[in-house]
UniProtKB/Swiss-Prot annotation:
Species lineage: Eukaryota, Fungi, Dikarya, Basidiomycota, Pucciniomycotina
Keyword terms: Repeat, Secreted, Signal
Highest taxon in the source lineage: Eukaryota
Signal peptide: 1-18
A GO CC term assigned to this protein in UniProt: extracellular region
Region (2 X 6 AA repeats): 32-45
Gene name, Swiss-Prot/TrEMBL: USP1
Name of this chain's protein: Protein USP1
Region described as 2 X 7 AA approximate repeats: spans on this chain: 59-75
Region (2 X 4 AA approximate tandem repeats): 46-53
Sequence repeats: 32-37, 40-45, 46-49, 50-53, 59-65, 69-75
Amino acid sequence: MKITMLFAALSAASGAFAAPAQAVAAAKDLSIGAGVGIGIGAGVGPYGYPYGAYPGWRLQLLPLRWLSLQWIPLRIPILPMVNTWCSVACAQNPSPAHLHTFKPFTSEQFLFL
């Protein structure tokens, strides 16, 4: 009984230490993604909305309907497979009011971009 309680206490303690670390890692991934995405916008939707594309995350940037950006062909495959496909799909079917979230790359995959 005491051994079981000891393991339960250790498990709870490890969870308490792991949760903040995971939250910090998630916030770090999001901030890195947003910074890169704003810098390398990958596509402009048919309604004049620019899209940023970056590893694992996609956000709708500022609506710029007042700029004539609809004619700029920026659908360039600058990211590997899934993110490139999502860039083209989102550029063709924009949904400005939504946040598009995709599975983030691992650190090893990020190095190959």
